[in-house]
Design a protein with these regions (language model features):
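Transmembrane helix-loop junctions in multi-pass membrane proteins
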Residues: 23-34, 59-64, 132-134, 142, ...
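Hydrophobic alpha-helical segments involved in membrane association or supramolecular assembly
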Residues: 43-60, 205-218, 252-270, 290, ...
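Alpha-helical membrane segments and immediately flanking helix-loop junctions
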Residues: 75-139, 231-246, 254-275, 286-289
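Transmembrane helical segments that form the transport core of multi-pass membrane transport proteins
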Residues: 63, 192, 196-260, 264
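Alpha-helical transmembrane segments of multi-pass small-molecule/ion transporters
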Residues: 102, 116-123, 127-180, 274-275, ...
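Membrane helical hairpin/interfacial module
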Residues: 38, 42-105
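C-terminal transmembrane helix pair
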Residues: 98-99, 108-114, 128-129, 157, ...
Length: 352
């Protein structure tokens, strides 16, 4: 009880301090809001919104158990739904993983153990961000992005295996398949419109976290002499990777690895928001610390086998990306998302 009261008091105090800082530095807050909104339109929404729609459609139908059985056995999962969710998480990223864990566990389609393993195995950055943005744009080599993406999945597997050695919850529960209730039948209204509506809500939640922590970072930076890399890495993963890549040399590569492992407060907030009762903070924290060491070791081991010289590890200044119009595909997707969001708001107001 005392711990709960202390947490509430700390949260109230932090909210009060943040409110004062926002009033004292409105320009910095506006700058953070603008950068967060631009990030959401340029990369977050194109990367996550389609995967949220696909996940809604796939989880509404029974999974292909026979096709998923090899992956299910390899990962030590009890239900084929969990194996399908892990595969989708590796493509969609941590937000998809948390959303699927919370939904499947909340509807009793997977056990507590499977929900925990889903978060540990599926909590990663998607290939669009790691390969395209981080490897191709920030680090300057697409091969490095592919290596980072594969290495972070391998680090997830290694960290989960280590936790299984010291945790009784890592052992399969034979009674789950017989004891769990039958999965509820999907509602009659389930389909593409409902999937899009749910994906809009999830995407707005993700964008809200990104914009909020961008504002917090901009405001704190205007008052405190905090190193930009430490602040951005602690708050938001994309800003942390951008600041790490700007350092050049080997610090760019291994700094990005550290940011990918520790995630940042924005990602932790999204995971807690979407996973609900399936959220396991202690196990996930230990897993991410182990992930940090495994990923650093794997990159040091594998980067020497890449063909050619390591161009990313140069001391040149960071690439300047000028502000310009969005690409046509990103602009079209952003327009469609805004239309869907406005339609949903109008529908909610009309129903009231």
């Amino acid at each position: 009880m005392n711990n709960c009261k202390n947490r509430q008091r700390a949260a109230v105090a932090a909210a009060g301090v943040l409110g004062i800082l926002l009033l004292a530095a409105p320009e910095a807050a506006a700058e953070g809001f603008a950068s967060g909104t631009a990030l959401c339109l340029a990369s977050v929404l194109p990367a996550l919104f389609p995967f949220f729609v696909v996940c809604e459609l796939l989880t509404a139908a029974p999974p292909p158990a026979r096709l998923l059985r090899p992956l299910q056995r390899l990962l030590g999962l009890e239900a084929p739904e969990a194996a399908q969710a892990v595969a989708l998480s590796w493509l969609g990223g941590y937000a998809v993983s948390a959303q699927l864990a919370g939904r499947l566990y909340g509807t009793h389609r997977i056990s507590r153990r499977d929900a925990r393993r889903l978060l540990l195995l599926g909590c990663c950055s998607g290939p669009g961000f790691v390969i395209g943005c981080l490897g191709g744009l920030l680090l300057g080599r697409l091969q490095l992005g592919v290596l980072l993406y594969a290495a972070q999945l391998a680090a997830n597997l290694a960290a989960t295996a280590c936790l299984d050695l010291f945790s009784a919850s890592g052992r399969p529960s034979r009674a789950f398949s017989a004891a769990r209730p039958a999965p509820p039948a999907p509602p009659q209204t389930a389909g593409l419109p409902c999937a899009i509506s749910s994906a809009v809500s999830a995407s707005l939640s993700v964008c809200g976290c990104v914009v909020f922590f961008r504002i917090v970072g901009a405001v704190i930076r205007s008052f405190l002499p905090v190193p930009p890399l430490l602040l951005s890495a602690a708050l938001e993963i994309s800003a942390g990777c951008a600041d790490a890549a700007a350092r050049g040399g080997q610090a760019a590569l291994y700094g990005c690895c550290a940011v990918l492992s520790l995630l940042g407060l924005s990602v932790w907030s999204q995971i807690q928001l979407f996973s609900g009762d399936a959220f396991c903070p202690r196990a996930l924290l230990v897993s991410r610390v182990l992930h940090f060491f495994f990923l650093q070791g794997l990159i040091r081991l594998c980067v020497r086998f890449l063909p050619g010289s390591l161009a990313v590890c140069s001391s040149l200044s960071a690439r300047v990306v000028p502000i310009s119009r969005l690409p046509p595909d990103a602009a079209l997707l952003g327009f469609a998302f805004l239309c869907a969001a406005l339609y949903k708001v109008r529908q909610n107001l009309y129903n009231k």
